[in-house]
Amino acid sequence: MTLPEIKDFMPKDIAKDIIKEKQIRPDRDQYFMLSAVIAATRASCIKFNSGAVIAKNKRIIASGYNGNPPGVPSCHEQGFCNKDAAGVDRSSKGSGHCLATHAEANAIVQNHEQNLQGATMYCLHFPCNECAKLIASSGIKEVVYLKMYREQVPKAELIFNHAKIKFRQMEMHYDQMLKKIEQVMKSTKE
């Protein structure tokens, strides 16, 4: 079926827009990363939102965001950050005040009985050292990220190199992705 034939099955204004305006379709990397961004919108941390998606065989098999374990009140629920309340520098690690689980760790935990050998993790930030250990132990073989984590994470890179895990920074064209979301939302109007 050709595009002109397809337009007969769509509302006229939408069909016209699709024909005159180039339809944007994300490639797989963009799709999986956009899914990680969407996962981050569920983060329960009030200071730092992060999301992760694990893909294997061209499918999402797990996702996660930074948030507290079940039953543990989050900063979002409390209305304050535990680190701020304790007067701890936000960038300090291992103080024990932050009770959230990182997005990468949550994605691994949320994977239900799926073998992660050879999978790819898409995350907003380059993983910290602790998450790098979990990623290596899980069998994930590639990590794609948008930004470097706030701190230097040379141990994470070392872990990935020893475990032969590929890692690469991805460039995301936000304007194109927002335009695609807008196209999708327009197509849902009646």
What positions do the PLM features span?
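Zinc-dependent deaminase catalytic domain
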Residues: M1-E190
